[in-house]
């Protein structure tokens, strides 16, 4: 009963910022569909996030297909109803749209479909839902849903097509959602956006993907007007007093395919090569090998850490692993893949590469550096006795 709704909203995610990823991935799916239907041309799709700290308000709006008025209640109002396909769509469980209920007083969905002169609105009393969830009463899921949802319509310009999610009166304990700097930093590695054009090695990534016949999905996403990019750079920095200074750089990229015994590509990756001076400090937000499905990051920068010979190995590198196989299915928290045979093969292949190639790269670099350091110390002592 009501426990299902609790699990799908307040109990689903440990990091409140995940709501942005959920709503953005839904918007990206609809942008893809809008391009397929000819509503948008490639490159015309946008997702705009607006946040007002004083009003504790957030809006996430796309210019994609929108939802037809006749389909609105069934598509948006039916819990976990989803017509999306595993392996094709970025979001496929249909539960992501509920995540905002945990973090605000009122959650509102507004949409209009091209050619229709009406906009459909669903308003959810999120505060009431949370109160009913903790009451000592045996509410059914339907009891709660019927009590918190209202539908309405209004006139709209037939030329308009969009879907908007609005969150009113963000909870005091979820103020992080209104921290524009933190949200932009979070989104820059999680959502499917382009590399920043100052990352000069990006052309090699696109060229390699093209050679494989793999399309890296990228969308224009803005936060209060600022476009979000993946914040990769060739410079590796370290703290030096109050400032940051460059201590190493990524000189080139190495690429690796991962294929099963039938020769089918299940994943591929790029990794940045440097002098491997040391473990990359935390001030480099891009550090670590990240795993991506449909160009959306799964988990954090440590998702693949357990596949290294030693945990610290992950942070000697910068790079991305792109899942290709449709059988690599993100779990409901989107922090890794569901367990299945393909995941076992994926992990075996990565573990072998991480052990045989990457571990040796930084281990040998460390050994040579330490040998050189010992040599310099010895020479210094020799010169003292001259």
Tell where the protein language model's regions lie, with residue ranges.
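P-loop NTPase nucleotide-binding/switch module
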Residues: 1-3, 7
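Generic recognition of stable, solvent-exposed alpha-helical segments in well-folded globular domains
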Residues: 3, 18, 22, 67, ...
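Alpha-helical oligomerization interfaces and scaffolds
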Residues: 10, 47-48, 54-61, 165, ...
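Conserved ATP-binding N-box helix of the HATPase_c
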Residues: 11-49, 96-102
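Interdomain "switch/hinge" adjacent to the Bergerat
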Residues: 21, 34-90, 115-287, 297, ...
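Glycine-rich phosphate-binding loop
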Residues: 85-104
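Glycine-rich ATP-binding loops of the HATPase_c
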Residues: 106-110
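Charged regulatory segments coupled to nucleotide-binding catalytic modules in large multidomain enzymes
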Residues: 241-386
């Amino acid at each position: 009963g009501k426990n299902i709704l609790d699990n799908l909203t307040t109990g689903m995610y440990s990091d409140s910022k995940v709501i942005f990823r959920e709503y953005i991935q839904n918007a990206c799916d609809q942008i893809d569909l809008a391009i397929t239907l000819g509503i948008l041309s490639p490159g015309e799709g946008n997702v705009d996030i607006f946040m007002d700290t004083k009003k504790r308000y957030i809006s996430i709006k796309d210019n994609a297909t929108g939802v037809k008025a006749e389909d609105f209640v069934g598509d948006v109002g039916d819990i976990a109803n989803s017509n999306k396909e595993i392996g094709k769509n970025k979001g496929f469980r249909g539960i992501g749209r509920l995540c905002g209920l945990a973090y605000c007083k009122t959650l509102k969905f507004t949409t209009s479909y091209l050619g229709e002169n009406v906009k459909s609105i669903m308003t959810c009393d999120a505060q009431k839902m949370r109160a009913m969830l903790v009451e000592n009463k045996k509410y059914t899921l339907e009891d709660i849903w019927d009590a918190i949802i209202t539908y309405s319509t209004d006139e709209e310009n037939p030329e308009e097509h969009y879907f908007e999610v609005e969150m009113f009166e963000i909870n005091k304990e979820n103020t992080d959602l209104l921290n524009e700097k933190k949200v932009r930093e979070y989104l820059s590695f999680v959502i499917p956006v382009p590399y920043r054009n100052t990352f000069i090695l990006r052309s090699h990534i696109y060229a390699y993907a093209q050679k494989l016949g793999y399309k890296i999905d990228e969308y224009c996403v803005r936060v209060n007007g600022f476009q979000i990019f993946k914040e990769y750079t060739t410079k590796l920095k370290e703290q030096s007093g109050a400032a940051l200074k460059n201590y190493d750089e990524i000189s080139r990229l190495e690429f690796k395919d991962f294929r099963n015994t039938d020769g089918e590509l299940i994943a591929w990756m790029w990794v940045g090569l440097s002098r491997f001076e040391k473990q990359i400090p935390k001030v480099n937000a891009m550090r670590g090998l990240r795993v991506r499905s449909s160009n959306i990051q799964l988990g954090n920068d440590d998702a693949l850490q357990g596949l290294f010979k030693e945990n610290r190995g992950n942070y000697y590198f910068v790079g991305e692993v792109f899942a290709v196989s449709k059988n690599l299915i993100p779990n409901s928290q989107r922090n890794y893949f569901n367990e299945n045979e393909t995941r076992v093969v994926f992990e075996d292949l990565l573990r072998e590469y991480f052990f045989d190639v990457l571990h040796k790269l930084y281990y040998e670099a460390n050994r040579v550096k330490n040998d050189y350091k010992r040599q310099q110390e010895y020479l210094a002592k020799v010169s003292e006795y001259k």
